Amino acid sequence: MRLLFLVLLVLLGLIQYPLWLGKGGWFKVWDLQRQVAEQRETNDGLRARNTALEAEVRDLATGVGAVEERARSELGMMREGEVFVHILPPGTPLPSGNSTPQASALSKPRPPATPPRR
């Protein structure tokens, strides 16, 4: 009887081995589920980024406003007659010398405006 119990115990152990430690065992399944969850999070972030980029491409392709906004923010461009004002944070030292190219344009007197004709 003891021998039969020992043989059955060994057989049970051999049957359980692939379930827990084998190629498709529970530990492998848990690890793969964790990897799938991480990949889903990555995919969600990339999907959101792609949606934002698609919207930006649509804006750039259809509207002039987006192109103008990008030219202003990234290239520092201005329309004719606009004045660029840069507000420095408190405690920032002032730049030495005249670093504004607009200063000479501001010092020129403007011609008087002519009244509209009727």
UniProtKB/Swiss-Prot annotation:
Keywords, alphabetical: Cell cycle, Cell division, Cell inner membrane, Cell membrane, Coiled coil, Membrane, Transmembrane, Transmembrane helix
Superkingdom of origin: Bacteria
Localization of this protein: Cell inner membrane
Region (Disordered), start-end ranges: 88-118
Pro residues: compositionally biased ranges: 109-118
Any single biological process term in GO: FtsZ-dependent cytokinesis
Cystines in this chain: none
Principal localisation: membrane
Biased composition, class Polar residues, residue ranges: 95-105
Keyword Coiled coil among record annotations: yes
Residue intervals passing through the bilayer: 4-21
Coiled coil: 28-62
Topology of the protein relative to the lipid bilayer: Single-pass type II membrane protein
Subunit structure: Part of a complex composed of FtsB, FtsL and FtsQ.
Function: Essential cell division protein. May link together the upstream cell division proteins, which are predominantly cytoplasmic, with the downstream cell division proteins, which are predominantly periplasmic.
PANTHER family: CELL DIVISION PROTEIN FTSB
Record's protein name: Cell division protein FtsB
Species this protein is from: Bordetella parapertussis (strain 12822 / ATCC BAA-587 / NCTC 13253)
